[in-house]
Amino acid sequence: MGATPLRLAGDTNLLLDLADGDEEVLDAVALIDQRLPQADWLVSPSVLDELAFLTESGDTLPLRQSASVAFRQLRSGRRFRAMLDLPFPSNFIEQVADEIRQRELIPAGEVHDSWVLAEAALLQCALLLTSDAHLRGVDHELLTLVLNQFDLAPPVIATPREIVRKFFR
């Protein structure tokens, strides 16, 4: 019996950057694919919700177009697995996300980011790849303490640039 594939999560910004052909993001994802070919890339429901919102109501036409391209890429199913539902009650996800904001790991107004982080932890993702400053700025040590209350482990939160800089040879 083989080992369970490593789970990785991408946030909305990652999917938009991939849709736009951002070289740094393409390089990071290619590097991860090369180093971890069996990795299970997950897209959580809150990321899907934000992407759907941006497709219809993004501030600019280019943003709406990028969101549409990102959805088409998701439907191809070549890299990412969209998680339409999670095997957890939504009130539990909300409780974890609320605690993340109450502890000021993420600003109170960034509800979506706290949900992305909570879902990544609940899905047991080892890595959350993002270019979002709020997610990237999370104090990992404090996040560990907060998530341990829920018997969860935090993902490593990294930007595509960090992945390329640290692991490209």
Ranges and model annotations:
Residues 49-51, 87-93, 160-169:
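A short acidic, often aromatic-flanked loop/helix-cap motif at beta-alpha or helix-coil junctions
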Residues 64-88:
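Low-complexity, serine/threonine/proline-enriched polar segments
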Residues 1-71:
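Short, well-structured N-terminal submotif of metal-dependent ribonuclease cores
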Residues 1-5, 10, 22, 43-44, ...:
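Acidic, PIN/NYN-like endoribonuclease modules and their adjacent C-terminal/linker elements
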Residues 32-35, 71-77, 146-152:
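Short, conserved catalytic or adaptor-binding loops enriched in Gly and charged residues
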Residues 79-127, 133-137:
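Active-site neighborhoods of divalent-metal-dependent phosphate/nucleic-acid chemistry enzymes
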Residues 31-32, 119-122, 145:
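A generic secondary-structure signal
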Residues 27-29, 114-116, 144:
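A generic local structural motif
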